[in-house]
């Protein structure tokens, strides 16, 4: 798994570095291209990478996380975000990494970015779920409960009930 991803990265990385004229991005859909151009208003001409290299990097991040190599995982997910700053999967993976690194502000950053580019109900719900986690981490159970409720409008993850119980316990209920 990881060795194959490292080989893909090693073979493709030099070809997709930005130049003075072009910025190279790895969009999964035409909608992501449109979101990127509207949100970031790039000064350089945008050239699309012909493979989902951002996806390779976030999968690589996931593998590194499983091995406890969090610093390397952070570098990988940051590169994924450079290649496609409007890919919701990148920010979902980023949030999971920040949870493991016990970095609440990183979780909030990932949620903020995710809500900018979320296009499905599940992605919106997962952003609210991670916001709920963030507010639990900073000991604000009222906001955590409100955001968990928002999550439930769009998406009910497997952990929904256990998170609700945790927040209820924090509130003394």
Residue ranges of predicted features:
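Residue-level signature for tetratricopeptide repeat
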Residues: 63, 96-97, 134, 167
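TPR/TPR-like (Sel1-like) alpha-helical repeat modules
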Residues: 6-11, 109-117, 139-159, 165-173
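Short coil turns that delineate tetratricopeptide repeat
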Residues: 13, 51, 85, 119-122, ...
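TPR alpha-solenoid repeat register
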Residues: 56, 90, 124-127, 160-161
């Amino acid at each position: 798994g990881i060795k194959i991803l490292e080989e893909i990265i090693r073979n493709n990385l030099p070809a997709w570095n930005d130049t003075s004229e072009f910025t190279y991005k790895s969009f999964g859909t035409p909608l992501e291209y449109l979101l990127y151009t509207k949100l970031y208003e790039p000064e350089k001409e945008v050239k699309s990478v012909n493979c989902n290299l951002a996806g390779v990097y976030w999968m690589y991040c996931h593998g590194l996380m499983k091995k406890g190599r969090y610093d390397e995982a952070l570098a990988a997910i940051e590169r994924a975000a450079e290649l496609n700053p409007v890919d919701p999967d990148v920010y979902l993976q980023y949030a999971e990494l920040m949870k493991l690194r016990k970095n609440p502000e990183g979780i909030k950053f990932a949620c903020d970015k995710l809500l900018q580019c979320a296009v499905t109900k599940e992605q919106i719900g997962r952003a609210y779920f991670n916001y709920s986690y963030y507010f639990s981490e900073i000991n604000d159970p009222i906001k955590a409960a409100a955001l968990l409720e928002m999550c439930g409008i769009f998406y009910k993850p497997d952990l929904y009930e256990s998170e609700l119980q945790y927040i209820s316990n924090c509130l003394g209920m």
